[in-house]
């Protein structure tokens, strides 16, 4: 209870204290009456001025007023509060008003104040037709104060003419005269209701009036130009601005009106101001600046401002120029390998995606091998000398970096064919002599077609990186560029793969029926090890032909044709060169649970029976490829040696020419592609162990595929038909299984083509492989090959190439044996290759020997006969009528 009462008393005391304080602060509170004596006199004559009006102002408000008597004295009483500042003002007609501040520090008992009034000077009034001019009455050598305005701005009172007008113009020519003007305390309003008082520093002052006959002021509406000369000792400069203040008699203070401009007239400075009305004007600056008065020159200000703007713009332009120079210099000096990246078109990108995703497990196997053996890979030497003519022989193929702009591109290797007939034949002779010396060192396993092919391939492939090095040295790249070039490729022939192959080789040497490729690695050197082509296999197989350069001539059949359009290849070219792509079937193995194995084909109802039969046969993928019993198969280890000897004998006796070169019946592998792709595939397939295949298949044996088709025409995978045909039924009688898209009829009689006599011989050379596969099921090697036929057009393929009828084992094995014969013969012409191949088949089937040795003229006639059999197409070929593959033609 007591605590609440105490709190209530405290609140009451606070309110009382606030009320008392507010009462004490009210105006008049504590003020005392004071009497002030004011004496008014003439400033020029010091005579008392009677009837002068005296007013006392505080805070722009009049608190007291009075009138002087005849003696010029007036006593004024008013309430004064100590600390307040008062302004005492005296004014009279024909005098310039004057004022003075009054602020005592203590409350006085008596106070007196004297004010001198400056009489106004009469001026000369000049009324013209358009202008009214008022000029000071004192004429002299120096300029005089003057005022002029438009005549129409003058508002004359009624019954008043120009003759009734009187003008007064008074200008302060000295500091003493400036003191005769009202006290210079200015009030500067900022437009927000708040005003600031300033003590002004005067420069000059002027008073101008126009009176009528009865002494009343005459109004002037319009701009009034007031010009006042300045003192000679003024510190102002030309084009300087000085504020103009107008005296308000009702407020007793100076109000800021505008700015006046200082001009230079000869040697005299004048201040000119456009006033809205007549009255008392003063040129002054605030706040007061001690020392000489200095104003800012507007021209200098504008000049500095413009220079600042121009300087900023120049700086910005300089920065932009520096950036442009830096960019240009960077583009010019940037290393070529950093910015020359081939911009592939959208179609080519889509084609590459189709190719890379349609290549079954070969990509996974290669990537797995690369991940298992990281780091730099090389090929070591086994003590075999380099062939003398190998370097010149491979000089016909140049690895050049081409880009659309014509400049080198380290990321786009292209094959440019350039042949020299004399160098080619001399290189072949040297290679033949080298092979005669190496014949004694060939093992039994290397006598097989696969072994000879792999050995000769590695002899030729060691020169291929050297050619790339020469091309790079001609471009002038440094070692850093070569490192980037080597780093952007994956190795094609890796040392761990060869080591693994060498370890697998001795394990199977006990069996004479084993056909295995013992590849002889090329002699190694630091330069060769560093310059091995490390390009990924999938990239090599999917290179678009749009950027390949077409050769100038076609020296022999079987060469790789590089052209931008298939339309440029005429009938003669097709009869000389047969582009083909052969992929071994054992490359393309699918797991049993793969989606494509059980994928149904979208076909008409009349084909459903055939498709069901093919899918039923897919469940037995490991059946024998050839129907011949094993008892009828006899190994012939000397057939390959006989082929090589016969090939060497024919090399010196026959001369090759494009005219007498015999052509292969089916689309075979070109010579360059046979070296770079088929031998590489056969060598790498040996390294794919059963363990790796089972790991990819999820621990289950991978079934043998029927066929595999790769899209190279830029179509998406959704538009590519994946068909599977059992190759094991290809050799059976009555089997007509073939590619659904290639148009190959396996049931067509082989006698329809005279050149098919060697197919039986080739089939008889490979049964040992089948027997060995049955004995050793874990061996990863397989001899089932599937040929991918390149058909640009159905009509062109039938009429020009003449290769629509073939068997997978016929075409694939002939291509392999053809490649082996070419390697054994040292890159002999195609005519010698055909003759040698048929001579090598003679021991297997003597009855077919006369038919195998036929001339080029007979082959051309057979091709014509085959063209006439265009109508004998299989149902599969007639149903599809479209090419299996087509390059991305633009």
Swiss-Prot record:
The keyword Hydrolase does not apply. Expressed in heart, brain, liver, skeletal muscle, kidney and pancreas. In brain, expressed by glia, pyramidal neurons and astrocytes (at protein level). Highly expressed in placental trophoblasts. Residues 325-890 are cytoplasmic. GO terms for biological process: regulation of cell shape; stress fiber assembly. Residues 730-759, 818-890 are annotated as: Disordered. Pfam families: FAM171A1-2-B_C (PF20771), FAM171A1-2-B_N (PF10577). Residues 822-833 have a biased composition (Polar residues). It is found in: Cell membrane. Residues 1-21 form the signal peptide. The chain crosses the membrane at residues 304-324. Belongs to the FAM171 family. This is Protein FAM171A1. It comes from Homo sapiens (Human).
């Amino acid at each position: 209870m007591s605590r609440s009462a105490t709190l209530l008393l405290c609140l009451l005391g606070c309110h009382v204290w606030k009320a008392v304080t507010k009462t004490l602060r009210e105006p008049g509170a504590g003020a005392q009456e004071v009497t002030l004596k004011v004496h008014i006199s003439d400033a020029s004559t010091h005579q008392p001025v009677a009837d002068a009006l005296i007013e006392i102002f505080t805070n722009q408000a009049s608190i007291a007023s009075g009138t002087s008597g005849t003696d010029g004295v007036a006593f004024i009483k008013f309430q004064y509060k100590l600390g307040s500042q008062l302004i005492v003002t005296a004014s009279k007609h024909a005098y310039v008003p004057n004022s003075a501040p009054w602020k005592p520090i203590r409350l006085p008992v008596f106070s007196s104040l004297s004010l001198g009034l400056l009489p106004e000077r009469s001026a000369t009034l000049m009324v013209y037709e358009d202008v009214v001019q008022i000029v000071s009455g004192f004429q002299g050598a120096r300029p005089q104060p003057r005022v002029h305005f438009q005549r129409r701005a003058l508002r004359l009172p009624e019954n008043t003419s120009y003759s009734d007008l009187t003008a007064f113009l008074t200008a302060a020519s000295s500091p003493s005269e400036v003191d005769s003007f009202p006290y210079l305390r200015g009030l500067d309003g900022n437009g927000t209701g708040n005003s600031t008082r300033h003590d002004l520093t005067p420069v000059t002052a002027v008073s101008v009036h126009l009176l009528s006959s009865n002494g009343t002021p005459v109004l002037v509406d319009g701009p009034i130009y007031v010009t006042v000369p300045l003192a000679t000792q003024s510190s102002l400069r030309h084009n300087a601005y000085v504020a103009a203040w107008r005296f308000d008699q009702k407020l007793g203070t100076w109000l800021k009106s505008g700015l006046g401009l200082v001009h230079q007239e000869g040697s005299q400075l004048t201040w000119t101001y456009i006033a809205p009305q007549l009255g008392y004007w003063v040129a002054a600056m605030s706040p007061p600046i001690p020392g000489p008065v200095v104003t800012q020159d507007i021209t200098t200000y504008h000049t500095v401002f413009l220079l600042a703007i121009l300087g900023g713009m120049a700086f910005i332009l300089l920065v932009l120029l520096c950036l442009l120079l830096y960019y240009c210099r960077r583009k010019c000096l940037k290393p070529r390998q950093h910015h020359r990246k081939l911009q592939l078109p959208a179609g080519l990108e889509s084609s590459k995606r189709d190719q890379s995703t349609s290549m079954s497990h070969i990509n996974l196997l290669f990537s797995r091998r690369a991940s298992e053996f990281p780091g730099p890979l090389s090929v070591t030497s086994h003590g075999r000398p380099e062939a003398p003519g190998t370097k010149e022989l491979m000089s016909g193929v140049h690895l050049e970096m081409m880009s659309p702009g014509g400049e080198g591109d380290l990321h786009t290797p292209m094959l440019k064919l350039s042949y020299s007939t004399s160098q080619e034949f001399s290189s072949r002779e040297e290679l033949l002599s080298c092979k005669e010396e190496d014949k004694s060192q060939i093992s039994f396993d290397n006598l097989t077609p696969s072994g000879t092919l792999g050995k000769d391939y590695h002899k030729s492939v060691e020169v291929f990186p050297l050619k790339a090095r020469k091309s790079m040295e001609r471009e002038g790249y440094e070692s850093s560029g070569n490192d980037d070039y080597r780093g952007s490729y994956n190795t094609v022939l890796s040392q761990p793969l060869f080591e693994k192959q060498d370890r697998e080789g001795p394990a199977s040497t006990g069996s004479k029926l084993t056909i295995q490729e013992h590849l002889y690695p090329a002699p190694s050197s630091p330069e060769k090890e560093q310059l091995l082509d490390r390009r990924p296999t999938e990239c090599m197989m999917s290179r678009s032909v749009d950027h390949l350069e077409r050769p100038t001539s076609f020296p022999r059949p079987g060469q790789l044709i590089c052209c931008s359009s298939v339309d440029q290849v005429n009938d003669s070219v097709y009869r000389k060169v047969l582009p083909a792509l052969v992929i071994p079937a054992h490359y393309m193995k699918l797991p049993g649970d793969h989606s494509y194995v059980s994928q149904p084909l979208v076909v008409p109802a009349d084909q459903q029976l055939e498709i069901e039969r093919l899918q039923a046969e897919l469940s037995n993928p490991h059946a024998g490829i050839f129907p011949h019993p094993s008892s009828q198969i006899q190994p012939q280890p000397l057939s390959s040696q006989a082929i090589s000897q016969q090939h060497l004998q024919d090399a010196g006796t026959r001369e090759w020419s494009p005219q007498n070169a015999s052509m292969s019946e089916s689309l075979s592998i070109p010579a360059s592609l046979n070296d770079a792709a088929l031998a590489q595939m056969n060598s790498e397939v040996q390294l794919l162990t059963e363990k790796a295949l089972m790991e990819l298949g999820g621990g289950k044996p991978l079934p043998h595929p029927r066929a595999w088709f790769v899209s190279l025409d830029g179509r998406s995978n959704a538009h590519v038909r994946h068909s599977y045909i059992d190759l094991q039924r290809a050799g059976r009688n009555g089997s007509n299984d073939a590619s659904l898209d290639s148009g190959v009829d396996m049931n067509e009689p082989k006698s329809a083509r005279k050149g098919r006599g060697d197919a039986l011989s080739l089939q008889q050379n490979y049964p040992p492989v089948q027997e060995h596969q049955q004995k050793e099921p874990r061996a990863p090697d397989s001899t089932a090959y599937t040929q991918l036929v390149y058909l640009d057009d159905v009509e062109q393929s039938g009429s020009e190439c003449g290769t629509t009828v073939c068997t997978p084992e016929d075409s694939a094995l002939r291509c392999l044996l053809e490649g082996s014969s070419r390697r054994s013969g040292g890159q002999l012409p195609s005519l010698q290759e055909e003759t040698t191949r048929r001579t090598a088949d003679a021991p297997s089937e003597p009855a077919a020997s006369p038919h195998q040795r036929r001339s080029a003229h007979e082959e051309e006639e057979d091709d014509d006969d085959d063209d006439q059999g265009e109508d004998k197409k299989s149902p599969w070929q007639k149903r599809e009528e479209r090419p299996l593959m087509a390059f991305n033609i633009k």
